[in-house]
């Protein structure tokens, strides 16, 4: 991947592995109290997870599925419960450790955890790839390249999310450009579907959009 991709990936790793680990762990713990704003994000992510999983068969027995950017492992658990052999990948070692600790004992034989880049060819072939909010910080050309490369190793579909190009999210993006802070989250980049299609092709389609308070995300599907 080009240097822009690597630079953003390293920034994402630094943020989630050093600055935001505890906050992310709380956000992804259902009975943990969070602020009203973060509660809307939690609810939005729960809804989006259900949308994404609806694109995969209920029975994934015999399927090899990558949870790309698995975080604390919520999607990983659901995929394993459907019978998939899950490759759970995240750039953050600390989040991987949390995901390992939270994995139910009866599912441990169904999941292998990996710290690193979801685009690493060494991860092998997959039937499906799920990438929830893992590509939201990257530019359209980089997303196109990731999809193209992953598509060569994916038999059925890549289901992923982006930040849609809305007035609300564009305002946040401009604020992030104007007032950068070294200790804050990397700035997500809103995308229009037609621009992404110019880099990934017409096999990229929109599935659904979830908007819940401060969480706004769009589910897309790429079929190689």
From Swiss-Prot:
Class of the enzyme per the UniProt entry, highest EC level: transferase
InterPro entries the record matches: Mg_prot_MeTrfase (IPR010251), Mg_prot_MeTrfase_C (IPR010940), SAM-dependent_MTases_sf (IPR029063), Small_mtfrase_dom (IPR007848)
Keywords in alphabetical order: Bacteriochlorophyll biosynthesis, Chlorophyll biosynthesis, Methyltransferase, Photosynthesis, S-adenosyl-L-methionine, Transferase
Gene Ontology biological process: bacteriochlorophyll biosynthetic process; light-independent bacteriochlorophyll biosynthetic process; methylation; photosynthesis
Pfam families: Mg-por_mtran_C, MTS
EC number: 2.1.1.11
Keyword S-adenosyl-L-methionine annotated: yes
GO molecular function per UniProt: magnesium protoporphyrin IX methyltransferase activity
Protein origin, superkingdom: Bacteria
Pathway connected to this protein: Porphyrin-containing compound metabolism; bacteriochlorophyll biosynthesis (light-independent)
Xref: PROSITE patterns: SAM_MT_MG_PIX
Substrates-to-products reaction catalysed: Mg-protoporphyrin IX + S-adenosyl-L-methionine = Mg-protoporphyrin IX 13-monomethyl ester + S-adenosyl-L-homocysteine
Function in brief: Converts Mg-protoporphyrin IX to Mg-protoporphyrin IX methylester using S-adenosyl-L-methionine as a cofactor.
Family: Belongs to the class I-like SAM-binding methyltransferase superfamily. Magnesium protoporphyrin O-methyltransferase family.
UniProt protein name: Magnesium-protoporphyrin O-methyltransferase
Protein's organism: Rhodobacter capsulatus (Rhodopseudomonas capsulata)
Gene for this chain: bchM
């Amino acid at each position: 991947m080009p240097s822009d991709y690597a630079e953003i990936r390293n920034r994402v790793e630094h943020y989630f592995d050093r600055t935001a680990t505890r906050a992310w762990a709380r956000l992804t713990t259902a009975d943990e109290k969070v602020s009203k704003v973060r509660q809307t994000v939690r609810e939005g992510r729960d809804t989006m997870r259900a949308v994404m999983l609806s694109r995969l068969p209920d029975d994934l027995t015999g399927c090899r599925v990558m949870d790309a950017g698995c975080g604390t492992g919520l999607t990983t658990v659901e995929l394993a419960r459907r019978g998939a052999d899950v490759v759970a990948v995240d750039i953050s070692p600390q989040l991987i450790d949390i995901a390992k600790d939270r994995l139910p004992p009866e599912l441990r034989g169904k999941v292998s955890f990996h710290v690193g880049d979801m685009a690493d060819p060494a991860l092998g072939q997959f039937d499906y790839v799920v990438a929830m909010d893992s590509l939201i910080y990257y530019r359209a050309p980089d997303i196109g390249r990731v999809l193209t490369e992953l598509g060569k190793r994916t038999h059925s579909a890549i289901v992923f999310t982006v930040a849609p190009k809305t007035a609300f999210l564009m305002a946040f993006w401009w604020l992030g450009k104007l007032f950068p802070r070294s200790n804050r989250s990397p700035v997500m980049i809103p995308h229009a579907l037609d621009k992404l299609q110019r880099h990934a092709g017409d096999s990229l389609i929109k599935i659904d959009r979830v908007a819940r308070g401060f969480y706004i995300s769009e589910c897309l599907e790429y079929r190689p």
